[in-house]
Amino acid sequence: MRRKTLEIYSVELDGTKDTKQLGQEEGKKCNELDLKKSSQKEELKKELDLDDHKLTSEELEQKYGTNIIRGLSSTRAAELLARDGPNALSPPKQTPEIIKFLKQMIGGFSILLWVGAILCWIAYGIQYASNQSGSLDNVYLGVVLALVVILTGIFAYYQEAKSTNIMSSFSKMIPQEALVTRDAEKKVIPAEQLVVGDIVEIKGGDQIPADIRLLFSQGCKVDNSSLTGESEPQPRSAEFTHENPLETKNIAFYSTTCLEGTATGMVINTGDRTIIGRIASLASGVGNEKTPIATEIEHFVHIVAGVAVSIGILFFIIAVSLKYRVLDSIIFLIGIIVANVPEGLLATVTVTLSLTAKRMAKKNCLVKNLEAVETLGSTSVICSDKTGTLTQNRMTVAHLWFDSQIFTADTSESQSNQAFDQSSGTWASLSKIIALCNRAEFRPGQENVPIMKRVVVGDASETALLKFSEVILGDVMEIRKRNRKVAEIPFNSTNKFQLSIHETEDPGDPRFLMVMKGAPERILEKCSTIMINGQEQPLDKNNANAFHTAYMELGGMGERVLGFCHLYLPAHEFPENYSFDVDTMNFPTSNLCFVGLLSMIDPPRSTVPDAVAKCRSAGIKVIMVTGDHPITAKAIAKSVGIISANSETVEDIAKRCNIAVEQVNKQDARAAVVTGMELKDMTPEQLDEILANYPEIVFARTSPQQKLIIVEGCQRQNAVVAVTGDGVNDSPALKKADIGIAMGIAGSDAAKNAADMVLLDDNFASIVTGVEEGRLIFDNLKKTIAYTLTKNIAELCPFLVYIIVGLPLPIGTITILFIDLGTDIIPSIALAYEKVESDIMNRKPRHKKKDRLVNHQLAIYSYLHIGLMQALGAFLVYFTVYAQQGFWPTSLIQLRVKWEQDYVNDLEDSYGQQWTRYQRKYLEWTGYTAFFVGIMVQQIADLIIRKTRRNSIFQQGLFRNKVIWVGITSQIIVALILSCGLGSITALNFTMLRVQYWFVAVPHAILIWVYDEVRKLFLRLYPGSWWDKNMYY
């Protein structure tokens, strides 16, 4: 019996067998650190030995050393409190804020910029140590690079700091006080002081202060939705009803809410040992994987660093072989590496992601982690919770059965379009029972509030019936006044019916009306007649069969079905002054008239089916993962399109072919409904097989730990997994997923804080918007990086020519800085506003290992095609400036040594003019300015061609993205300021530049545009060709 308890309990609480086998597989590949982390997570998922729900009161007293009547003694309670600690959740070890801040300072691009800054300072140190009259340019450049990292890091840290800690949100759920019996006295004590063995009392509206084994109960119902995902209130009693502690009715769980009734129970678990405590530990113990965009940025950093170091070392060797001093060669090496660092890209990517996050916030997607913006676009699997995410999170009347027909009710948010026949006399009787046999009431003062938005005092089912009646019949409270209630038996789990007796509003009819609703089979047992078309008829075999057929059909749709009946009590037996006694039941409860059935369901949101269809066309697999019943889960999955209309499960095929499930070929089924019980017995390989072979999957009756295992299974398939949810039970999976998406309205604080994104309108359809934005930002980041990398070659070539050919330096490091952080920042960001080129929601999600942010096609095209063309254009401007001042290009070759000697003040140009060191320096700065302007003019063309990767810019529209033109204007203004307004400030290394030099590079800019248009034309003409594979980035 013991083993059975543990085995069945594990269905809902964990998947230890799965994780153990998974750990054994992964252990072969993991290092010791990974194994240590795996064992820690294993510890969180281990099984609990709990059989308190099976014990009698006497056995419980003996086990916990308490007394049901007197409670614990204060002395014993103090001892237990000292032994077990307070009834509170232990916060996990916090990462110090300084560590969080430092992580922002050295991650991704940041490390590249830090290396660049340090190399700049080293270069200056080498120059200073060797007594060279080196400028402070390298010092300034190092400082600016450091500032870029620090400012961007502060911004990113601020974004992260806005997220609150998960554990604090769990703590908010904990009740503050509890009513406890100690020393035979009732006391109100802080909930933190509860210990195992305490006898506590709860009532409607209270939060359960610990895991409690109920001893006495009176009409107690609890809301377990935050733990199990079940929409319906769960009745609680002292009876042992199920082997599984999560299913039995005699245990109430820490932090769930008592909706109505009263109960007394014994505390059996406190703090971290409670179910909620284990979920809290599991959620905070799950580590976040790297986001796809973080991986891409790391990959990009490796590419840039690899290119920079390779070129630097190559030219270091060349410089040494050309007899340069080793110290000078080291400085050249550093200069080449720094020239390859895209200084502005860190800020550009951060700002671009922030802008997209703001855009998504306007569409009800609040992004907490900036990198999650792109992750949503990479998503290939969405594991969605059912209750409150796919559904409206409110019970709604879905179908009615009367007059031997099933009618469909309007389950939309308004319920205003009820199209079923309301002319029948049977409906008149049924609607009256629905309105009267109901304890729910609207809170006063809501007359001007729409019916569906009014606050109701009552459970979910009663609320659904009240609102349904109010929409169809009008003022229900007025109907109740006219039909005064004189007696009532509330619903309880033993009787399974609710009964009330009323005076009738007909002054000519002195009879009392008894109305009853409850479990259909129980209601039918009490009836001898049935109402058909307003007339009572004997309840014969045919009518009973019609009832059973309808009941099975409605139940098969996953709906909660209620039966309704009534009886007019004879006036001579029950006169006007008759005293009804509900304890002795001095009135008949048999030979009633059956009137009809009504079924309820938590209906899907109206926008969800379309959203699921869009996910399907976008190549995204939507998996439902819920704690609800498999029949209900499957019904909702079919209604929203997660399971297609023509898809069948193995069970469906078996039923259709009238054969055993084992005889069905599993490959014939497209859909699968997997329960927690089945999942518990699966190995990781079997789970992987299901995830790989079935395109349409529903997981039902799953525990929080199993949701986590499902997410891990999807990630083993190399899927980028998004998880949606709103309950505490979803938080571990939200944390583990590549992107966690919580509901903003109905979501618990725990779910919101575990998530990377919050849907402010709780609408699954908003995810589709987020996916589109995520895919668009990936495309646009590609364009931004391509635009940024292009000028790197134009900035690098001057150093190479300076070393090999010995020309005067064409451009300085400060000038490069003004390009990267001055003229190019706004245009780079402007590309984030570019619209889609094609319907990006009709393509498959990108493969995270094949579809890279920076691939070799992008690098080659940016560096070797456009980059070299841009370098040639900039050199043309440089040579033009020197030629017009008297230095022909041939005269500049190997002139560098003489050019830089301070004591040479009579250097002759091609015309025999003599140049002093100051005049040469001024001309050199003019060359810097000209080279800068040459790059800037060509970058305008580069910016325009980057608007698209395949389409012509005329197809895309030159003026659709007006921010691009703001960027171009900013480029020109910054260049004008530097070459005109600030040209006299020598520290900036700029000079006043003649107007004609601005137009020298224009032909090259036009050539860049024409060249790229030809590339795109061939891409469109020959899709899938060699050209397409090698020239499309």
Swiss-Prot record:
Tissues of expression: Found in skin, kidney and distal colon.
Topology feature Lumenal, residues: 118-140, 318-329, 802-811, 876-927, 981-995
GO biological process, one term: sodium ion export across plasma membrane
Subcellular location: Membrane
Keywords: ATP-binding, Hydrogen ion transport, Ion transport, Magnesium, Membrane, Metal-binding, Nucleotide-binding, Phosphoprotein, Potassium, Potassium transport, Translocase, Transmembrane, Transmembrane helix, Transport
Record family assignment: Belongs to the cation transport ATPase (P-type) (TC 3.A.3) family. Type IIC subfamily.
The protein, known as: Potassium-transporting ATPase alpha chain 2
Native species: Cavia porcellus
Gene, per the UniProt record: ATP12A
